Amino acid sequence: MRFNELQPAKGSRFAGKRLGRGIGSGLGKTSGKGHKGQKARSGGYHKVGFEGGQMPLQRRLPKRGFRSLKKLGTARIRLSELQKIDAEVIDLNALKAAGLASERAVAAKVYLNGTISKAVTLRGVSISAGAKAALEAAGGSVEE
């Protein structure tokens, strides 16, 4: 087989509709658009969500909630992920260096998920009550 002999698999490709090419094609004359009207014109169609002047659904329904910017800037860390870090003292910079927190994070919080057997010191990182108890049971400590 040569490059010039390559062909797509049977049925994988099909020709597009040829519009306005005679009455026998089934898509001649008006090209499947019917007679007159907005939708028959070139570029003639309503915008997405337009309901003919009726108040559209996305405007009838009430707004709800918001995206907390505090949440976007806070990295959420599992307790078990602290095992991967070699440092004795773990702060936000250590979490960023280990790839556990994004570079844009301005704060971090450790949650109880998994276990920890290594004694580490958390500095400047908030921690949930359950995770704090597990960390202190493993011999670690938390500094504010």
Curated annotation (Swiss-Prot):
Belongs to the universal ribosomal protein uL15 family. NCBIfam families: rplO_bact. The keyword RNA-binding applies. One of its GO terms (molecular function) is structural constituent of ribosome. Residues 21-31 have a biased composition (Gly residues). Residues 1-57 are annotated as: Disordered. Gene3D superfamilies: 3.100.10.10. It comes from Dichelobacter nodosus (strain VCS1703A). GO terms for cellular component: cytosolic large ribosomal subunit. Keywords: Ribonucleoprotein, Ribosomal protein, RNA-binding, rRNA-binding. GO terms for biological process: translation. Part of the 50S ribosomal subunit. The keyword Protein transport does not apply. It holds the Pfam family Ribosomal_L27A. The lineage of its organism: Bacteria, Pseudomonadati, Pseudomonadota, Gammaproteobacteria, Cardiobacteriales. This is Large ribosomal subunit protein uL15.
